[in-house]
C-alpha cells in the first residue's frame, strides 16, 4: 500500500506567518500559481482531503476533477484564540507565553486543542486507510504522522513539516514502511529510506 501525504498550497496566513489551523481559508493567488506549476503522475488511488477549502482546492488544482472523500479528523490543529495572529502580536501576552514556553504538545491554547489531542484524532484516522491513497492535508498533520511512524529519526514534528505543495510518499510493503520526501526546489522525490525507488514529478506544460 502506498500513501502520499501532500501539504496544501499557500494561503494568506502562510504568507503573513499567522497561526492558522481551524480557520477555513482558501488558497492565496500565489498559492494557486505555485501549484499550477506542479504535476504529480499519480493514478489509480483513492483521493482524500481534510475537507477544508485549502485542501480541496489544492487537490483540484493538482489532480483535476477526480472524485474524493473528506475526513475532518485530518484538519490542522485548532489554535483557538491564537488563530490568525502572528508571533509578534501574541508574544507578550501571558496566555501565549504560558503555551509557547511550556510543552505545547500537552498545553492547550485558549479555546483550542493541544498537539496531543490533534495527534490522536489524526492517527486514528490514518490507521483506517487501507488502500493506495493521496491525502491532501496540513503541515502539522503530516508532521504528526511522520513523527509517529519514524521516531528513530529523532526529529520534532516541526522538523517533519514539508513545504506547501510538497510532502512524503510512504510505502507499506512486507510490514516495512519506507519513506521519501518531495521537494519543489528539485521537483523530485528524494530517497529517505533504504532501497526506495525515487519518483520524479514533471513541470506542468499546459
Language-model features: where?
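Short active-site segment of divalent metal-dependent hydrolases/proteases
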Residues: 11, 141-142
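Active-site-proximal alpha-helix that buttresses catalytic centers in soluble enzyme cores
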Residues: 2-69
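Short beta-strand scaffold positions
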Residues: 49-50, 120, 136-137
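Generic beta-sheet signal
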Residues: 3-4, 45, 128-140
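Domain-level recognition of soluble alpha/beta enzyme cores
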Residues: 152-178
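Phosphate-handling substructures
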Residues: 62-121
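Conserved histidine-centered catalytic loops in small-molecule metabolism enzymes
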Residues: 42-73, 98, 150, 171-206
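Short hydrophobic/aromatic-enriched beta-strand-loop microsegments
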Residues: 26, 66-73, 153-162
Amino acid at each position: 500500500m502506498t500513501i502520499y501525504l501532500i501539504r496544501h498550497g499557500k494561503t494568506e496566513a502562510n504568507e503573513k506567518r499567522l497561526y492558522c489551523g481551524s480557520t477555513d481559508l482558501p488558497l492565496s493567488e500565489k498559492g494557486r500559481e505555485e501549484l499550477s506549476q506542479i504535476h504529480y503522475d499519480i493514478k489509480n488511488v483513492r483521493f482524500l482531503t481534510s475537507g477544508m477549502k485549502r485542501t480541496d482546492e489544492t487537490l483540484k488544482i493538482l489532480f483535476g476533477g477526480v472524485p474524493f472523500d473528506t475526513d475532518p479528523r485530518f484538519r490542522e490543529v485548532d489554535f483557538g484564540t491564537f488563530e490568525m495572529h502572528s508571533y509578534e502580536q501574541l508574544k507578550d501576552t501571558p496566555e501565549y507565553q504560558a503555551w509557547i514556553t511550556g510543552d505545547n504538545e500537552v498545553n492547550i491554547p485558549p479555546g483550542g486543542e493541544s498537539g496531543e489531542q490533534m495527534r490522536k484524532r489524526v492517527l486514528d484516522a490514518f490507521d483506517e486507510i487501507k488502500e493506495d491513497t493521496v491525502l491532501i492535508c496540513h503541515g502539522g498533520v503530516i508532521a504528526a504522522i511522520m513523527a509517529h511512524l519514524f521516531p528513530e529519526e529523532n526529529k520534532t514534528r516541526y522538523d517533519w513539516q514539508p513545504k506547501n505543495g510538497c510532502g512524503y510518499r510512504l510505502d507499506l510493503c512486507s510490514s516495512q514502511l519506507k519513506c521519501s520526501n518531495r521537494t519543489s526546489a528539485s521537483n523530485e522525490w528524494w530517497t529517505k529510506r533504504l532501497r526506495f525507488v525515487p519518483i520524479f514529478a514533471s513541470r506542468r506544460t499546459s
